[in-house]
Amino acid sequence: YHYLTGKNVADNQRLRFMTGDYYKLINEDNRRVTVGLNGMWWHYQKDLSGYTLGQGGYYSPQTYLSLAIPVNYRQRTDNWSWELGGSVSVSHSATSSRARYPLQNLLNNSIQPIPDRYEPDDGGSSNGVGYTLRALIERRLSSHWTLGAGVDIQQAKDYTPSHALIYLRYSMAGWQGSLDMPPQPLVPYSDFK
């Protein structure tokens, strides 16, 4: 549960529930194959996805449901580690009609009348299918240096946050043991938690 607040934006409440499980088809020290099933449910008290004064401009459906089936293959050797994976998902979302200007006190009619001040924005529902593809690879160059690369392709209607990266990591202590499986790439600042 989260209570969302902001300046000149209507307050909102959200509930989110996520669950999932996976099965290891192959579970060896240096190789692993998994398949899973993930589910998500979101509920927002208000749809504040609009961009008028008082709206939040963020995705906030009253109902969002999704199911995904992820598959991953991971392997490592003495100086290499890689992962290939992907998933396919289906989703459903629904929103109610909403006030175009949820905070009427922010509007001042004495400056300029707003003809659509009390007009609602219609809600609706939609269904979608999406997929992700991911590939990561790392190569140990020496005890201290590791070179890595990755690509993450995400595709869904109106949402495609794909990215690729190449990185060079330096370990001050040095390491000749097993590489991480899966590889641990640098995390984009936008994904940092």
Regions found by a protein language model. Give the residues of each.
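Outer-membrane beta-barrel translocator domains and adjoining extracellular loop/strand segments
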Residues: 9-16, 45-54, 95-103, 160-165, ...
